[in-house]
């Protein structure tokens, strides 16, 4: 099986598409499907690209380590749609919510909650989806978002044993040699 502990993010970048195709070909109808909720927006284009790389890493981790078919529109849609254009951003959000409706689990990844993530968490709560959080730092905020939706936080769980999914993009996609492999 694929060894997730990669020596650098470039290798992961080169394998993520193949791994996702493998994932789609070999998963059965019984394989859980999850929507990866993580930040996309950033102050710079480089930051957006790092967040896109991070979500692809989260998807690979979910497949390899959790046995979950993970989906995330922000892994690829920014190549086609401009997040700074309100019309295109809304289209991307609508595509994401349509994908979310087809999943049974919401994986809340990273160590912060963005505006787009708040909408995804609200929608998952309204739909009764299982919500898994990987960073204790954002757990209370996720629970508050669920409660704002008029629901209890019973569907929200913390899974700290998979701490890789709590790492921010700048740790997963390091600009120097120290990165995610140092914490795995």
Named regions from a protein language model:
Residues 1-184:
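Conserved catalytic or regulatory cores that recognize and/or transform ribose-phosphate-containing ligands
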């Amino acid at each position: 099986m694929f060894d997730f502990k990669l020596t650098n993010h470039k290798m992961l970048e080169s394998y993520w598409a193949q791994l996702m195709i493998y994932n789609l070909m070999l998963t059965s109808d019984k394989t859980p499907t999850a929507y990866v909720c993580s930040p996309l927006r950033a102050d710079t284009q480089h930051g957006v690209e790092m967040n896109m790389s991070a979500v692809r890493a989260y998807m690979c981790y979910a497949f390899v380590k959790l046995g979950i078919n993970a989906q995330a529109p922000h892994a690829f849609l920014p190549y086609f749609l401009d997040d700074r254009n309100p019309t295109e951003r809304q289209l991307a959000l609508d595509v994401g919510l349509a994908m979310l409706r087809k999943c049974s689990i919401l994986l809340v990844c990273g160590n912060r909650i963005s505006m787009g993530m708040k909408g995804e968490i609200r929608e998952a709560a309204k739909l009764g989806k299982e919500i898994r959080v990987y960073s204790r730092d954002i757990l209370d905020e996720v629970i508050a978002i669920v409660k704002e939706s008029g629901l209890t936080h019973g569907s929200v769980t913390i899974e700290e044993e998979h701490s890789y999914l709590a790492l921010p993009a700048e740790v997963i996609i390091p600009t120097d040699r120290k990165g995610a492999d140092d914490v795995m």
